């Protein structure tokens, strides 16, 4: 019987691979300690965070992940905000990102979430094509403002 890949909840043992995926696929240089701390924290907050990994069972290796946070506001129904979707470059184009998003959407629907939204930098044209190919529509162009509180 041929082994298959699977989508599952993230585990602390995934930290090293998640760190690598964040660095290579998203361009975020982050310490292993930070990744471990965040996996622990977010895994315990199941009412507000959905964090799934795609594991290639044949290779016994995590090759991608999706992370979404519950989006609540005074002016809309509950939704999800995608905070990260990443797949290692050598595994891109194989439907992994699509499977992760579908898995997330099914679980969100089961939890009565009414929409999923995400932001993507304007230069990430290939990512935009991907999101459109799985049914997402660009409904707004905006700028991000940030203020550091340290």
Residue ranges and their predicted role:
Residues 10, 85-87, 120, 136:
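Hydrophobic adenine-recognition pocket in adenosine-nucleotide-binding enzymes
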Residues 118-127, 146-149:
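Conserved beta-strand-loop-alpha-helix junction that forms the acyl-donor binding cleft
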Residues 106, 143-150:
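Terminal substrate-recognition subdomain of acyl/acetyltransferases
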Residues 49-51, 140-144:
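Short hydrophobic/aromatic beta-strand or adjacent loop that forms the aromatic wall/cage
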Residues 98, 122-141:
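Conserved active-site alpha-helix within GNAT-family acetyltransferase domains
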Residues 101, 108-120:
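Conserved GNAT acetyl-CoA-binding A-motif
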Residues 5, 9-16, 20-78, 83:
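Acetyl-CoA-dependent GNAT
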Residues 87, 93-106, 133:
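Conserved acetyl-CoA-binding loop-helix of GNAT-fold acetyltransferases
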């Amino acid at each position: 019987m041929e082994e298959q890949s699977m989508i599952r909840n993230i585990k602390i043992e995934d930290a090293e691979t998640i760190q690598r995926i964040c660095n290579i696929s998203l361009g975020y240089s982050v310490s292993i300690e930070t990744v471990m701390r965040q996996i622990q924290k977010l895994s315990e907050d199941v009412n507000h965070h959905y964090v799934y990994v795609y594991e290639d069972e044949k290779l016994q290796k995590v090759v991608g992940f999706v992370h979404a946070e519950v989006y609540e506001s005074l002016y809309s129904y509950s939704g999800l905000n995608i905070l990260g979707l990443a797949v290692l470059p050598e595994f891109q184009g194989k439907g992994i990102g699509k499977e992760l998003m579908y898995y997330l959407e099914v679980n969100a629907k089961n939890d009565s979430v009414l929409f999923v939204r995400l932001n993507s930098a304007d230069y990430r044209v290939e990512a935009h094509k991907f999101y459109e190919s799985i049914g997402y529509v660009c409904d707004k162009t905006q700028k991000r403002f940030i203020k550091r509180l340290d």
